[in-house]
Structures are given as structure tokens and as C-alpha cells.
Amino acid sequence: MLETAVRPRQAIDVAATLNSDMERVWALTQDPAKHARWDVRFGRITPTGEGRFRYRRFGVGGTGEHSGDRWAADGSATSALRFACRNPLSPIERGSGYWRYTPREGGGVTFVTWYDYRSRYPMIDRFFRPLMAWGTAWSFDRLRLWADRDVPPEFSASIALADAAIRAGAVIAAVLMLDGPSRWAAAVALTILAIRVPALPWAPSARRTSWSVGSVR
């Protein structure tokens, strides 16, 4: 069993199904430069030697340590790490987790992550942790688009931004163009529709993955 740096509390669990082979998925996730391109949680990942690295996002940096890989006879693999941040601007104090790669019958890989962390600000974490889970799930689908369809992460993020802008624009237009009670009724209806309509095929979507908060392993 993998060692963890903290006891499970409200761990985050995300799984995505990719059609790419193990070699490609491993390359896109284990290379720090490639990892930073698809994972919205990181702006930059810099190796510092002996399995250690520094990461930065929105001007807040932390450190991490790769704590080992395990390969099973069935071809599956698990990669574990620990991470920490001393910056008081970060809600995350320290944590640990792993990635698991499981080959699928007929081809492809099921890519899973499980991680937990100690929050610096428990009250804020009630909102921050679900956001982290959603961001991880969104990033996993962004990885899928890159691995399976050769859609660069930067391009898929641009498509997602444009998609969100169109949805928001439709709601705003309804508020500005209509009068009376119908204005707000239309705005509510369009907001619900904007949330429910599936994302464009080239835009990442957390809905295409399975994710949860509160997993214990």
C-alpha cells in the first residue's frame, strides 16, 4: 500500500477513460513540461533533481517529491508523490496522492488520480476543495483531447473559453433585450440551458470524467 503524508479526510478522486496506449499517456503525464500544459492546477513545474520539483500557479509556489512508481504484472502502473506549500496565500498546506494507469481490454487506458491534502484554511476549503476536484476532472478531459485527438491543451482551453463566453453572452443578451418579468424568466431558463448543454467536442468538460470528493482508499 502506498504511503500517504496525511490521513484521508475529504480526498479527491478522478477517473478518465483514454483511447491512447500506455506509452503515450505516460509520456504526457510524467514529463513535467507536458504535465503543466494540460493540468490547470499548475502554471509551471520545474524539476530540481532526485525526484523533486517546484511548482507555481498564479504567483504562488510550492514543492513536491516523486515518491516512486510501481508496475504490476497486468501492465498497470502507479505513480505517487507528496507536495507542500509554505506560502500563506495557498489554501493547501501539504498533501499526497497518486496516479494509476490501468490498461483496458481492447486498447486504451483508465487514468485515475486520488489525492488528499491538509487545508490551511478549513472554512475556505469547503468551497475550494470541490473547485479543485472539478479542475482536476476538467484537466483530465483536456489530457484526453490531447492524447486521443491531438488537440493541443492551449487550443482546447481557448475553445472552452469561447464556449463559456457564448453561453454567458446569450444570458446577458436576454436580460438586455427583453422587458418585464419575461426578462428574468428568460435569463433563468437560458442559464439552466447553458449549464446543461454539453460542451463542444474540442472543449474539455469535467462531465466526461467521473469525479468525487470524500473518497477513502
Regions found by a protein language model. Give the residues of each.
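Hydrophobic-ligand binding "helix-grip"
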Residues: 36, 40-47, 51, 56-108, ...
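Intrinsic-disorder/low-complexity, polar/charged segments enriched in Ser/Thr/Lys/Arg/Asp/Glu/Gln
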Residues: 9-17, 94-96, 108-112
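Terminal, regulation- and interaction-focused segments at domain boundaries
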Residues: 2-24
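Terminal "cap-and-tail" regions of soluble proteins that handle hydrophobic small molecules
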Residues: 2-5, 104-217
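Charged, solvent-exposed alpha-helical segments that act as regulatory interaction surfaces
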Residues: 14, 38-41, 145-152
